[in-house]
């Protein structure tokens, strides 16, 4: 095989991974000095070289974890193809990440942000905060994806190129307004443009929140109302249940009931 990295990326593309995943994986694999010929020392030396950014600052644990995952997937594919006998990622140390809770937009701020927004921006904010869509999904969703008969919004080829449905709420429909044709946000945009537009609008209105924190608001409210992590993962397009628990924020009433129950004997 003349170029194993190109062959791997072609296989990943056939599996319908997102363009963002393909770009990130190609970038990481390009740093491997000898993709199929790295022994333990070479693998550890490569890993050491990834600990700092070009500017000399240390890489964040989340970034390192992603780099390790991309390399490990490549080597796992190489083993399936009979190109390697073992996965060099087994020599790499575990990346420890701090488990942080999601930060969400306060309800008062969300009300003000929606009230002041022009229709295209109001729809972007609503799709993130009231439907839990990612920036790429907001850019792609069209009026034809609103299925009023079944009460759902269809998200076509979300993360991992997977389709899913998001239940429609009266509040979301009110913020979206009268249906039209084409993209719900009013024009063709990509994920980066949506994220940047939301960020600029939020900062202009005195908020340092982001598109992701608008999405986090939806997931925390969904979990608080249902207590159903499986349903939350499905509606959010998460394949891993463990990633949804960071959005679980217990209310003070829930914690008080728990404390009262634990404080009783018998």
Predicted regions and their residues:
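Conserved tyrosine-mediated DNA breakage-rejoining catalytic core shared by Y-recombinases
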Residues: 140-176, 242
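Short pre-functional
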Residues: 72, 122-136, 152, 220-221, ...
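Active-site/catalytic core of tyrosine-dependent DNA strand-transfer enzymes
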Residues: 169-208, 218
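Active-site-proximal segment of tyrosine recombinases
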Residues: 137-138, 209-210, 219, 227-238, ...
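Basic, Lys/Arg- and aromatic-enriched nucleic-acid-binding interface segment
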Residues: 84, 96-99, 107-135, 139
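DNA breakage-rejoining catalytic core of tyrosine-based enzymes
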Residues: 84-86, 97-112, 160-170, 182-184
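N-terminal core-binding DNA-recognition domain of tyrosine recombinases/integrases
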Residues: 6-101, 206
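Catalytic-site neighborhood detector that most strongly recognizes the C-terminal catalytic loop/helix
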Residues: 157-160, 236-261
């Amino acid at each position: 095989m003349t170029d194993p990295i190109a062959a791997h990326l072609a296989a990943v593309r056939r599996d319908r991974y997102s363009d963002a995943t393909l770009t990130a994986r190609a970038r990481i694999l390009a740093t491997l000095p000898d993709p199929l010929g790295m022994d333990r020392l070479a693998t550890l030396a490569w890993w050491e070289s990834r600990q700092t950014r070009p500017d000399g600052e240390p890489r964040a644990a989340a970034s390192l974890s992603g780099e390790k995952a991309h390399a490990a997937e490549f080597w796992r594919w190489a083993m399936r193809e009979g190109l390697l006998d073992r996965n060099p990622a087994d020599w790499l140390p575990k990346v420890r990440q701090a488990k942080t809770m999601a930060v969400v937009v306060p309800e008062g701020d969300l009300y003000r942000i929606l009230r002041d927004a022009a229709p295209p921006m109001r729809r972007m904010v609503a799709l993130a905060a009231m439907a839990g869509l990612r920036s790429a999904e907001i850019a792609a969703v069209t009026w034809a994806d609103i299925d009023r008969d079944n009460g759902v919004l269809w998200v076509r080829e979300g993360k991992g190129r997977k389709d899913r449905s998001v239940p429609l709420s009266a509040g979301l429909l009110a913020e979206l307004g009268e249906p039209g044709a084409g993209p719900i946000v009013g024009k063709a945009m990509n994920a980066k443009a949506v994220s940047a537009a939301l960020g600029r609008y939020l900062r202009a209105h005195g908020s340092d929140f982001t598109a992701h924190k608008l999405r986090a608001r939806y997931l925390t409210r969904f979990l608080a109302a249902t207590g159903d992590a499986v349903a939350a993962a499905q509606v959010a397009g998460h394949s891993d249940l463990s990633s949804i628990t960071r959005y679980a924020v217990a209310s003070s009433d829930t914690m008080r009931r728990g404390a009262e129950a634990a404080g009783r004997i018998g």
